[in-house]
């Protein structure tokens, strides 16, 4: 397992190119699994279920077709994006379990900062109850699987400019807002969040099994 960390924002095309190359190498057993933690410059991405009507400010930032599941989301500085390239041939061919584990990864990491992240039936991602029936989204998930190799992953709001989410209907859900660690009073650094994510990953996913691959 390789952990990669980007010190400066990574362009979206560069990230896509890296993932395409890496998952091909994982499939051919020429590279190991990888988690890449990074930030992007401000941009919007459209998943395969995105409704064009949900792009409210099309000229605000660059918009990219992501190829992942889900709808529109915002990426930008202060948001920790995790691209998770795992070999499900070795880990059990269960995409639902993989998505559930990504949610658990964020829930555990948030708990280290005394934030209670929660799942919601029918709404992939992580939510925080704010009282009075209000709840805001703090973590998003959008994945793709090719030949049982995962790519894309999750985005956790640490200290992004939350106003930038107003240019879209985030994940197609207009009834709820977005929040971040800083918005909730937890002024964690990205490096502190990275450490929490790594610990949570080890607890949730564990090491990659070493048994031989089955044909696909």
UniProtKB/Swiss-Prot annotation:
Catalysed reactions listed for this entry: octanoyl-[ACP] + L-lysyl-[protein] = N(6)-octanoyl-L-lysyl-[protein] + holo-[ACP] + H(+)
Origin superkingdom: Bacteria
Listed EC numbers: 2.3.1.181
Residues binding substrate: 68-75, 140-142, 153-155
Primary subcellular site in the record, as a coarse category: cytoplasm
Catalytic machinery residues: 171
Site (Lowers pKa of active site Cys): 137
Keyword terms, alphabetized: Acyltransferase, Cytoplasm, Transferase
PANTHER family (UniProt xref): LIPOYLTRANSFERASE 2, MITOCHONDRIAL-RELATED (PTHR10993:SF7), OCTANOYLTRANSFERASE (PTHR10993)
Other remarks in the entry: In the reaction, the free carboxyl group of octanoic acid is attached via an amide linkage to the epsilon-amino group of a specific lysine residue of lipoyl domains of lipoate-dependent enzymes.
HAMAP family associated with the record: LipB (MF_00013)
Role played: Catalyzes the transfer of endogenously produced octanoic acid from octanoyl-acyl-carrier-protein onto the lipoyl domains of lipoate-dependent enzymes. Lipoyl-ACP can also act as a substrate although octanoyl-ACP is likely to be the physiological substrate.
Family per similarity comment: Belongs to the LipB family.
The name this protein goes by in its record: Octanoyltransferase
Lineage: Bacteria, Pseudomonadati, Pseudomonadota, Alphaproteobacteria, Rhodospirillales
